[in-house]
């Protein structure tokens, strides 16, 4: 009897595996069937950046050598990006703490104050920063975040900050809903702290270090790894052959480089700051602290007339700012009508017969987790992958939906990842046929915050090339980019994952993918505009809005 029972269980297991394989094959065939053999020339089919002449800035090559041969257009693009970001930090020499920016002494004032404003009007706010001696600052470079909000309406939007490099800043808001609207301004980091962060970015890229385990038989060794390592010891070169993405490990003493089996985060370097520098990173003093108003901090907004409202409803153009706003806890993009996917059946209907590829860090893994939790028909299969690492796979057999998640290649600060699972996004994209039933979403940013900007630019350049090739061979493929987001900060976290670092990455990402033909989920504005505290992994209500926007790109409203 037990023998028959065992045979029955074995048969059932084999049958289940066979069903999954058949489903994967069937869904994958959809990609081939929907692939159109049209040689479509994209708006920017080369994936190149076109810019006016820019003045290059003097920077030493990362690691002391150039790791990638750039075309003249790529060199121009990189110089333009670096120059634009470099101008934000003035070089004023050493500054004592008492002369650094004090948020409690600084203030803002509403400039164009009026009895009331109409929806769609511009609101201007002047911010004047002072030091701890209550003396006006004479230079800029502080990193400010600003938003307008109405808590009772669960409404919010971000403002655009302009630095006049003299201690004065202007913030521009668009008033997008009626009612009592409050202004909030925060000092994320003083300019003196920003200079420290910039030094760490350029001089201490190894402040997050990685390791790999090498094993052969009973012998095992662990060595340090990174994008760049000192050349005075023998190295294992794991640079990717297709993308040229560099990755090195110190060579084990007894084992060959080919015996590497895992990759994992080694840890964070300590003692990065001097005592004087540490004063610029104090919780409750100068990290994400509010700047108070001098006078009223709110305005009254009244509705527009119907004709005016219709003309305001959707703003056109790639430079629309802000890109959207919250109202009753729902994100409202200003360029298009976003659908609300409040029922699992709505998501199932949208994704039916589709293959969805999610590539990147843990912030897009949240999408996988949300979908598999919210949609009961999406059943996750246990691939034996480490928790929080992946790869992960979920299938809806009834509706032919295949959902995949895979983390991006190193640098990645996850716990143990098998080395054969370290796949670069560009290489994965090159293996996708594409078509109208293929959806790709990418989020690559958080694990690059400690490196010089050239490292991130190179990674995005490789991904962009692969995206352009994918869209050229399959124009109906939907490609979505999830931007960076703000997060909680303390003295230590600021040195590795500061919003200032991520703001730079976000700026680079937007510029490099402008005109390529991808959709953008603006996670940056969606976290800054919301009333909930900033988190690396935003709360569910924010993730839900991100997914609603993502799915609206996949299944837009019919017009």
UniProtKB/Swiss-Prot annotation:
Keyword Secreted: yes
Predominant subcellular localization, coarse grouping: secreted
GO CC annotation terms, alphabetical: extracellular region
Keywords: Glycoprotein, Secreted, Signal
Secreted recorded as keyword: yes
Annotated localization: Secreted
Residues carrying a glycan: 237, 292, 346
Signal peptide span: 1-30
Domain of life where this protein originates: Eukaryota
InterPro entries cross-referenced by the UniProt entry: Ig_E-set, NXPE4_C, NXPH/NXPE
Similarity comment: family membership: Belongs to the NXPE family.
Protein name: NXPE family member 3
Species the sequence originates in: Homo sapiens (Human)
Phylogenetic lineage: Eukaryota, Metazoa, Chordata, Craniata, Vertebrata
């Amino acid at each position: 009897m037990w023998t028959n029972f065992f045979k029955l269980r074995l048969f059932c297991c084999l049958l289940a595996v066979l069903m999954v394989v058949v489903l994967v094959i069937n869904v994958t065939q959809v990609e081939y069937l929907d692939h159109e053999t049209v040689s479509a020339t994209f708006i920017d089919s080369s994936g190149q950046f076109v810019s006016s002449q820019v003045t290059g800035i003097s920077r030493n090559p990362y690691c002391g050598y150039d790791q990638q041969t750039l075309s003249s257009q790529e060199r121009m693009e990189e110089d333009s990006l670096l120059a634009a970001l470099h101008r934000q930090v003035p070089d004023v020499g050493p500054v004592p703490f008492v002369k650094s920016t004090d948020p409690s002494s600084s203030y803002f004032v509403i400039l164009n104050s009026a009895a009331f404003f109409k929806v769609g009007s511009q609101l201007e706010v002047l911010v004047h920063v002072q030091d701890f001696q209550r003396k006006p600052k004479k230079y800029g470079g502080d990193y400010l975040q600003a938003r307008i909000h109405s808590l009772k309406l669960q409404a919010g939007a971000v403002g655009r900050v302009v630095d006049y490099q003299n201690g004065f800043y202007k913030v521009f808001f668009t008033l997008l809903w009626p009612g009592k609207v409050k202004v909030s301004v925060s000092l994320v980091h003083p300019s003196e702290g920003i200079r420290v962060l910039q030094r760490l970015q350029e001089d201490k890229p190894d402040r997050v270090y990685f390791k790999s385990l090498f094993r052969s038989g009973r012998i095992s060794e662990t060595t340090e790894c990174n994008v760049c390592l000192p050349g005075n010891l023998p190295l294992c070169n794991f640079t990717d052959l297709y993308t040229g993405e560099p990755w090195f490990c110190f060579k084990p003493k007894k084992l060959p480089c080919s015996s590497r089996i895992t990759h994992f985060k080694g840890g964070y370097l300590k003692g990065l700051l001097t005592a004087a520098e540490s004063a610029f990173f104090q919780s409750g003093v100068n990290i994400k602290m509010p700047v108070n108003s001098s006078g009223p901090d709110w305005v009254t907004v009244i509705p527009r007339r119907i004709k005016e409202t219709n003309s305001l409803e959707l703003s056109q153009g790639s430079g629309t700012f802000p890109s959207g706003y919250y109202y009753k806890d729902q994100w409202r993009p200003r360029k298009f009508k976003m659908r609300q996917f409040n029922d699992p059946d709505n998501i199932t209907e949208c994704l039916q017969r589709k293959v969805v590829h999610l590539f990147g860090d843990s912030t897009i893994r949240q999408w996988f987790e949300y979908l598999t939790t919210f949609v009961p028909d999406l059943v996750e299969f246990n691939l034996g992958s480490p928790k929080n690492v992946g790869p992960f796979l979920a299938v809806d057999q009834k509706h032919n939906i295949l959902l995949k998640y895979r983390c991006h290649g190193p640098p990645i600060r996850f716990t143990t990842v098998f080395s054969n699972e370290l796949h670069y996004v560009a290489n994965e994209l090159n293996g996708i046929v594409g078509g109208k039933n293929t959806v790709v979403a990418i989020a690559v940013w958080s694990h690059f915050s400690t490196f010089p900007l050239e490292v991130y630019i190179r990674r995005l350049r490789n991904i962009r090339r692969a995206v352009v090739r994918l869209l050229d061979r399959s124009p109906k493929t939907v490609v979505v980019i999830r931007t960076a987001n703000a997060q909680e900060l303390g003295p230590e976290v600021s040195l590795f994952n500061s919003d200032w670092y991520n703001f730079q990455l976000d700026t680079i990402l937007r510029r490099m993918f402008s005109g390529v033909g991808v959709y953008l989920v603006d996670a940056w504005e969606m976290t800054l505009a919301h009333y909930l505290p900033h988190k690396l992994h935003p709360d569910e209500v924010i993730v839900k809005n991100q997914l609603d926007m993502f799915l609206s790109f996949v299944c837009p409203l019919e017009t």
